[in-house]
From Swiss-Prot:
It holds the Pfam family DUF1444. NCBIfam families: PRK13668.1. This is UPF0354 protein BA_4944/GBAA_4944/BAS4588. Belongs to the UPF0354 family. InterPro entries: DUF1444 (IPR010838). It comes from Bacillus anthracis.
Length: 270
């Protein structure tokens, strides 16, 4: 049998077939690239060189190249995961629950409108953790949740502030992909609660913003409702157009007629 670059490509693809790897063949340069699907990191194999080795060592040449490629890709993957951080991300309850059929994401309930997912972030790549990835990482769901919340608490925050009609609005927008995630930082929420004199209202209209408001009158409720709707419509990854009253660690959704609820509460007190 005469070995050609095309035949060698087929032989290597058979030996290196794994669901997490992709193959790209450049017929002009006679190069086969094997790379990780998620990170796009990979190895280029010059096929004429492997064919020349095959002429001398036959099957052993193919085995050696396949082994080298496999070990290199596995090492890349381990290095990437060791540098990666697991962080929680906030998504709408309408966000898909599965990566694909039979492979659910790791999730935690948050509010009536939001759910917590978990991302493996290595700065260059960002992937939501599903059951298959969980197995590859060798972690339990509990470990993922604990690591994610620990890392969320390490995220910095610096708010911009605006006051309208006596109501103060604090905006966090670092565009690091985790602005909404700061809603899970209990110490941050408590520190804001201490400086707020009225109702503490929190909103995560999309992934890249966290709004905390000190609402002291009905106009404030109208403003936060309009503001949240606007941010929700403009967001790259929208979450919810509703905002929440935060009290004692709980989030109560505010509906469009929140100001009417406030009026009713006032009459009952009277």
């Amino acid at each position: 049998m005469k070995m050609t670059s095309k035949k060698m490509k087929d032989e290597l693809m058979k030996k290196l077939s794994r669901p997490e790897w992709d193959f790209h063949y450049d017929s002009e340069k006679e190069v086969l690239r094997i790379e990780q699907k998620d990170s796009k990191k990979g190895i280029n194999v010059s096929l004429p060189g492997v064919v020349a080795k095959w002429e001398v060592n036959k099957e052993k040449a193919i085995e050696e190249v396949a082994y080298y490629v496999q070990e290199a890709l596995i090492a890349m993957h381990k290095e990437e995961n060791s540098a990666a951080k697991i962080l929680p991300v906030i998504r709408s309850t309408s966000f898909p629950k599965q990566a694909e059929e039979g492979n659910p994401f790791i999730m935690t309930d948050h509010t009536a409108e939001t759910r917590i997912y978990y991302a493996l972030d290595s700065n260059k790549t960002y992937r939501l953790i599903d059951e298959r990835l969980l197995q590859k990482l060798g972690l339990t769901e509990k470990q993922v949740r604990e690591m994610a919340l620990f890392n969320a608490r390490s995220l910095g925050y610096e708010f911009k502030q605006d006051t309208v009609a006596g109501n103060t609005f604090y905006f966090l927008n670092t565009n690091d992909g985790y602005d909404a995630t700061r809603i899970l930082n209990e110490s941050l929420l408590q520190s804001m609660r201490e400086k707020i004199s009225g109702d503490m209202v929190v909103a995560v209209p999309h992934q890249d913003v966290l709004i905390i408001a000190d609402i002291v009158n009905e106009i404030g409720y109208d403003i936060i409702a309009q503001m949240t709707m606007k941010f929700f419509a403009e967001g790259h990854v929208p979450i919810t157009s509703l905002s929440f009253v935060y009290e004692d660690g709980d989030f109560e959704p505010i509906f469009i007629l929140a100001k009417n609820r406030k009026k009713t509460d006032g009459k009952e007190k009277g």
